[in-house]
Amino acid sequence: RHAFPAPRQPSAHAGLFDLLHMGAAASHARTKTLETAMGPILFRSFCPPSFVERLRPDSGLHSFARLPEREHHLLLDIAKSPDCALTLAYTPAGEIVGQVTIAPADEWWEDIEDLYEVAVEVSVNWRRATIARTLLSFALELDALEDMIFFAIGLSWHWNAKDLGISLHHYRALIAHLFGTQGFVEYPLTDPDVSKERTNVPLARIGKRIDKHVANQFLSRLLSPDSFGRF
């Protein structure tokens, strides 16, 4: 499975920022600072390519692309897409230690409106610095939050539980709790092949203003036997 979206044709919309902020006259980028036991961490939303280029990846940022350098290229591609929103956590020295990507769902979901996939990662070197929850919460501070459906597919083969000295089941519980703090709900596995690995987990947050028909359409697709087979 591609952890990050493949390059797409430019959206007919002005950009994902305008959709997520309902046309509000706000700055495209917000910033925040978190003091941790390992030092201060800076957060920035809607990171432009020029900003990503000036940063470098921490050595522990490699869950999705295997190598930090490759992941940096992926993050740069995401920043270049008007359809995606990239939020980064980084040190004052310019090392990327975490990221949250919000991207339109792929073609398999194309008839479902206002649907976005969320991917989050924190460097293994910074996992005990309480960054993930703050980063995800910061990325989801959106005016249109209740008008959107967000989902995340937790696949255990992306997880580096051994680096943390914990089991996959413990890691799964951490993932579910992390997203649960932002209103995501865990759903059951239905694909017979993927469900053999009980640590995989689908999570979703359905906005309060989403039409019931759209919500039911999404859940029917998410829980279909073909859903996880795509990944």
Protein language model regions, located:
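Short, histidine-centered active-site or binding-site loop motifs used for metal coordination
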Residues: A119-E121, L155-S156
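Cationic, low-complexity basic patches in intrinsically disordered or flexible, solvent-exposed regions
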Residues: P10
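Conserved acetyl-CoA-binding loop-helix of GNAT-fold acetyltransferases
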Residues: V122, R128-A144
